Swiss-Prot record:
The modification N6-butyryllysine is found at K19, K24. The modification Citrulline is found at R3, R9, R18, R27. This is Histone H3.3C. Specifically expressed in the seminiferous tubules of testis. The gene is H3-5.
Length: 135
């Protein structure tokens, strides 16, 4: 009889069926205290969904008031009695978020170049160095 080559197949079934008697007896003797586990997505699924959602949207991602407080705190180092128009703070926030998004895109490319999917501080440093922002 000639030998035939075995090919790998995806399994369709799960575990083998258990005996019914043991499970029925166990169910009757102990009250069911544990509930059904809540549904959980696989790692990375929610992250990808968030990435797609934020790439579609155009709204600002940093909250306005915390950003405004940060701007005022930084400006106090230079001049104590500065006032800001709301449009000026809005323009600063737009520019800041655009800069951060671009930097994180370049950082992600640096991580991918290093055959990683996790960004690290050294990726940000490399991206800034290539851009010429930091020597």
């Amino acid at each position: 009889m000639a030998r035939t080559k075995q090919t790998a197949r995806k399994s369709t079934g799960g575990k083998a069926p258990r005996k019914q008697l043991a499970t029925k007896a166990a169910r009757k003797s102990t009250p069911s205290t544990c509930g059904v586990k809540p549904h959980r997505y696989r790692p990375g699924t929610v992250a990808l969904r968030e990435i797609r959602r934020y790439q579609k949207s155009t709204e600002l991602l940093i909250r306005k008031l915390p950003f405004q407080r940060l701007v005022r705190e930084i400006a106090q180092d230079f001049n104590t009695d500065l006032r800001f128009q709301s449009a000026a703070v809005g323009a600063l926030q737009e520019a800041s978020e655009a800069y951060l998004v671009g930097l994180l895109e370049d950082t992600n490319l640096c991580a991918i170049h290093a055959k990683r999917v996790t960004i690290m501080p050294k990726d940000i440093q490399l991206a800034r160095r290539i851009r010429g922002e930091r020597a």
